[in-house]
């Protein structure tokens, strides 16, 4: 099968899709507006379309005006499947390419933030969804947004991404007896609400004398967050690691007592899935994306988005009752990941759908 992805080339998700389906023996092409090198995508046919600056935070309407370049490339490549990752910029532009087997995967903020907050985005994504032969979303909440747009729900499937169990597992788990380790693996952007976590840590730092905090991830707010860390007198506890690879994330999670995600919005919290697979005790914001994985007080804690004191109390509770809490949560989380959180299993659904589309 010849599959052409149309997506942000610097995204981990894009690399993951391209590499996975190449590993299954398919010929993979990537069309992107991002300047990426061939070394970043070995064995993938990369086609970079010069379109001016691309803002990773969104608002890339100028990309749509390049639809004729995309249409021309797609005609040259002649893919069996043309698949856009991200419903707004790439999805809308891809819809204008006119491929009969056009697929859109929504990744989260495209539906949960952009579409909800803008009538222009609503109209654009409604158009793109009409043109798509198949649409995948990562959660029931995203499916509900698609339904609200008037989408034909017979062509919408909920497909969580999940984790690679060869990387994210608890076989190498090793906790320090001298430190209580809290880890965040979310990027340093506004939507991930890292200041909220830092403020909660400030509340508990004197009650957890051996507290160590790992903040993995990169983003535009790093300097601001480092300044806040100093202001809150957390420099002794908090370390910013910047951009790290999947193996480093897994290694850190396996040395962490607690994983915290205080995101304001998520499509499917893959970072949460990774932490569950590595047996870290999970504390996350009480949003739909997290409720599909965590039942509060059963296999983790859910906290209100704006409640710093509530988050602090849950971190402190995890510190005081860690063994009891994790003994209960660990087996539940392992079973959940095994059932519906394995990347390769979930991608079998995608490959089967690709094959069905070709038959029709």
Locate each region found by the language model:
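N-terminal subdomain of nucleotide-sugar transferases
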Residues: 1-44
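Carbohydrate-associated surface elements
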Residues: 141, 162
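Aromatic "clamp/platform" in nucleotide-sugar-dependent glycosyltransferases that forms part
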Residues: 264
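Conserved donor-binding/catalytic core segment of Leloir-type glycosyltransferases
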Residues: 4, 174-201, 205, 214
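Nucleotide-activated donor-binding/catalytic signature segment of Leloir-type glycosyltransferases, i.e.
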Residues: 226-244
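Conserved acidic donor-binding segment of nucleotide-sugar-dependent glycosyltransferases
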Residues: 296-297, 301-308, 317-323
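Short hydrophobic beta-strand element within catalytic cores of glycosyltransferases
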Residues: 281-284
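Short His-centered aromatic/hydrophobic patch
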Residues: 66, 84-90
